[in-house]
């Protein structure tokens, strides 16, 4: 198409999202290798691409426009590796007073991600030889924790804790459409609101959520979340377990099932039993609730159960499938 290409180099997905957002790009492509190669399309703000953008890209490929593009239309690839330094500065800004007196260890299956995480904590004055274990997801977008007592705290509860303190400070949050429903109840308690952006919106119904999310990049960046979590521990002088006591106990279980009919048909039949969402339906049950979302392709249905314990959430999924 003759578009200019900016190359961010070898980065985590979270770094790529930062680069797309910081540089105000319309679209970004994150390419991963390994046993299964993947190309992920990011839209404005480093958020999931919209359906119109996907259709536009599909049209370019279907029409073979890249084949007909003259050689003179191809621009030199711009080396944007320097954005990684700007990303590091953004990480440091998450803890303007440093992390001296705090201890935590970094862990990630991606060695580069672990090195970056540990280096960031160390430069901020954090003791990285002991303390809670901060697990960064391989793509860099999520954070989970094993506290000093050995209890594993999943990403969803860490996200809920971070959102809670945003509510306490009088701010709304923007989260993915499949984020825990418990966070909405927490927001109501403080007179705040949770805006949700879709995985692949067909229109601009989630535009406000996307606008807010562009200013809350740390909620979808595991390293930023980790740094801000440690800042919270330092500022309050409380342990992670004490902070989490303010978050309602909940657990989530996700399942994907293949249907013999269209997911849309099933959701239509369940329409009267639940509350419609922008991209699915939420069914309330005595012991929790289930979020049902159709897949973008095929006849797969994604089920997210949320309840007080993983066992109850698993039972909710089983009862629905029966």
Residues covered by each model-derived region:
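N-terminal small/polar loop signature for handling phosphorylated ligands or for N-terminal nucleophile
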Residues: 1-39, 117-152
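Conserved beta-strand elements of the Class I
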Residues: 27, 103-105, 132-134, 174, ...
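Gly/Ser/Thr-enriched, mixed-charge loops and adjacent short helices
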Residues: 36-131, 148
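Glycine-rich phosphate-binding loop plus the immediately following alpha-helix
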Residues: 47-70, 158-190
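Phosphate-binding and adjacent anionic-ligand microenvironments
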Residues: 139-141, 146-151, 155, 165-322
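Short, surface-exposed connector motifs at secondary-structure boundaries
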Residues: 2, 96-104, 166-172, 190
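Structural motif
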Residues: 32, 107-111, 175-178
């Amino acid at each position: 198409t003759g578009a200019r290409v900016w190359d961010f180099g070898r980065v985590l997905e979270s770094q790529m999202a930062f680069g797309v957002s910081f540089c105000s790009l319309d679209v970004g492509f994150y390419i991963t290798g390994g046993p299964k190669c993947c190309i992920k399309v990011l839209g404005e703000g480093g958020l999931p691409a919209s359906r119109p953008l996907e259709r536009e890209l599909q049209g370019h490929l279907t029409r073979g426009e890249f084949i007909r593009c003259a050689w003179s239309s191809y621009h030199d690839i711009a080396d944007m590796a320097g954005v990684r330094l700007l990303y590091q500065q953004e990480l440091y800004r998450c803890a303007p007073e440093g992390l001296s007196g705090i201890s935590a260890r970094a862990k990630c299956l991606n060695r580069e991600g672990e090195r970056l995480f540990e280096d960031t904590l160390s430069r901020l004055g954090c003791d990285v030889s002991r303390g809670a274990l901060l697990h960064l997801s391989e793509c860099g977008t999520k954070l989970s924790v094993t506290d000093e007592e050995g209890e594993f705290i999943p990403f969803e509860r860490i996200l809920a804790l971070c959102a809670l303190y945003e509510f306490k400070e009088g701010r709304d949050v923007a989260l993915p459409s499949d984020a825990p429903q418990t966070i909405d109840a927490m927001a109501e308690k403080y007179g705040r609101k949770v805006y949700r952006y879709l995985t692949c919106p067909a229109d601009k119904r989630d535009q406000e959520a996307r606008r807010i999310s562009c200013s809350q990049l740390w909620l979808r960046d595991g390293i930023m979340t980790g740094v801000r979590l440690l800042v919270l521990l330092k500022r309050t002088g409380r342990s992670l377990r004490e902070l989490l006591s303010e978050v309602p106990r909940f657990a989530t279980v996700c399942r994907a099932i293949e249907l013999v009919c269209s997911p849309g048909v099933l959701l239509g039949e369940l329409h009267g039993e639940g509350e419609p969402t922008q991209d699915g339906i939420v069914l309330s049950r005595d012991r929790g609730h289930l979020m049902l979302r159709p897949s973008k392709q095929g006849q797969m249905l994604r089920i997210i159960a949320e309840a007080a314990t993983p066992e109850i959430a698993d039972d909710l999924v089983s009862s629905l499938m029966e």
